[in-house]
Amino acid sequence: MYAHLAQMLNLLVTPSSGPATVFTDGPIPDNDAMKEALGKVDALKFNVETGKVIRLVPAVAPDIGVTVVVEGGKEYKLGYLGHKPYTVVAGKAMITRLGAEIEENPVMGEHVKTVDPLGSTNVKGVFVAGDAATPMKAVANAIGTGERYCRSWDRAAVDNGGHGEDLSLEEVHINTRPSSTATEFDKTHHIIEKMYPLESVRHLVVEQSQLCYILFGAVLAYAGWRWVLRLDILNEAITDLMSNLLNYYLTRRYPIHHSETGQQIPGRSYRWPNGQGDQGKFLDGIENRAQWAKEHGRIYRIWAGTTPEVVLQTPEHIKLVFRDSDRHSKAVNNDSGYLMGQVLGQCLGLISGGDWRRVREVCEAAFTHSKAINYLDLIHSRVGDYLQKCTALQRGTLNPADDFKFLPFLVVGDILYGHMTQEMEDELRQMAPLRERLFQFVIRGGLARYTWSQYLPTEANHALREFRSRWVAFNQAAYCRARERGATATPVYQLFTAVSDGMITAANAYQTLDEMLFANLDVTLGGLSWNPVFLAANPAVQEELYENITAAQEAEGPAMPMYLQDSSTYLAACILESSRLKPLAAFSVPQAAPTARVLDGYVIAGGTNYIVDAYALNVEHEFWGPDRHEYRPGRFLGVKGADLRYHMWRFGFGPRQCLGKYVADLILRVFLVHLVRNWRLGFEDGQIADSREWKRDLDAWITHPTIELTCTPRGARA
């Protein structure tokens, strides 16, 4: 508990304040739990004082703070002092008579045991709410920490003539020995009243009462809405009414007019509560984009929640918008609302300006073009081991998205944390389904878009709390491991060192690691899983690639470092062609230009978010010729990267391209080399050859195939 409190206090540490100090009030017990807690404290670079605390001396007005005096006369002058006291349940006798069960924790204190999020107890009809129902007491923590705590000491000194009377440790109940009698509890309560005047306490009670009414009203509204949703006719009528009213308001709140005709930009009407995002953009985006383009032309507007997004489909428009992409800002929370903000809102890919530059400065060294090749042996080892153990390859039938799901996951994990232990791999595999379920709530939108939804007992909030708790614990342990091993080049070490130095926030670190591992699991898997499908559907291309790989292997050996770094090879062309025909998603993530743009006569204000229709650009545009729908990797041979600029969306445009693009390409190339030189891929009988008709996972926000392939060993493995 105290280690957790120390982590919270770490957010207040600044370069001028110096490291925080943890007072143990005596010798530290020698047990595993305490060793783990000290490991966390040590990782934060905190000082630890093991001397017995003798007294606390409050500052004299107008100064604030408190001086902690320990055995031997050593003094610590602090501006902020926090403590979590042992607490007992007030009205315990009444609760016991009711038969409600009271739990006791040797550190946290007592609380009434609840059996569900609604506060039910073991006694039917008896409910409990507030601090009585949780080990983590909000009021006790508020009293025990913060600026008001220090000011209250000053107030106590003034009440005693301004002499700064010393208050002993026993008087303020700051030690960890439990209060076992009512007399001791009353004594502590008396001291608290001394520290907080009655007006402050009354104000606190009023604020709590108001909050309770707000929460109660929110729960009632939520319950009422859930009931309304069961009545389909009424639900549809309410949705239509809300949609029409909000569409009328939003189109006037965010006008986009033609400079000559004055007409509004064409586009979709707002549909409550999500508009057209995220489900409309991602889950159903492939079907929707064709219909929307047909109805509205080559430039139009959609709504992500209540935020407008302008859809770009042509290289000319993209060039006009992205000419100053270094000054663009990403949409707040990706235009996906509150829950997205809690999961990835502070990650590298979704922040802008100075925050983005600081986080990128910490991360980029591990993902540069020159650094990526250093991971070649690691990637070869992971890929070879994974494919050798893949039961799908052994049985002769393969579903690429399912059977190769964790391959890029494990490679990236080794890069982020250093070579992972089996325990680390197991924990990440166990967290992956929870993270996937959490992101499904993000994509579905609805209540999860709104900040007030955090107060509701929803499954999304439960999943968020569970994932966040496990993710923080995993990364804290991984950081300690990296520090102990001297793995200072790993991103986990660099990120949390930057947090300690005050360069970035803890949220930046946790969410950027999440983005690199879990968010990019879907992204990398999307690119990795479509390549085998295209090769299986095109045997001639597959055989040409096999011959190309064999020749490179004979020239360089099995590792083929030069071949794998070369972006002009047939292997690289196959990957590009697959990415062209099957973009990761129908639309790019939203970002805004800093100044106004005029597109086809429509004046679009600075700060308006744009998204790119990837299929319109990658597949439908005439740049790709009459065979634009066919898989022909040769179209990329001899073509320079500059010639493709603004004609193909893959890693983005300009300085804000995907940080991990070099590592991602290397993973894809090594994977295809191992796969093609050892197995021959094919389609099952009756499988459709036209890629436009191939089935995909309709529940995945990134395009993943749901296609069974046949795989036959080519002979002795290389």
Swiss-Prot record:
EC numbers on record: 1.8.1.-, 1.-.-.-
Signal peptide: 1-20
Lineage top rank: taxon: Eukaryota
Cofactor: FAD; heme
Region (Thioredoxin reductase ataT) residue spans: 1-215
Disruption phenotype: Impairs the production of acetylaranotin and accumulates the intermediate cyclo-L-Phe-L-Phe.
MF term (GO), any: monooxygenase activity
InterPro entries: Cyt_P450, Cyt_P450_CS, Cyt_P450_E_grp-I, Cyt_P450_sf, FAD/NAD-bd_sf
Protein's recorded name: Bimodular acetylaranotin synthesis protein ataTC
Organism: Aspergillus terreus (strain NIH 2624 / FGSC A1156)
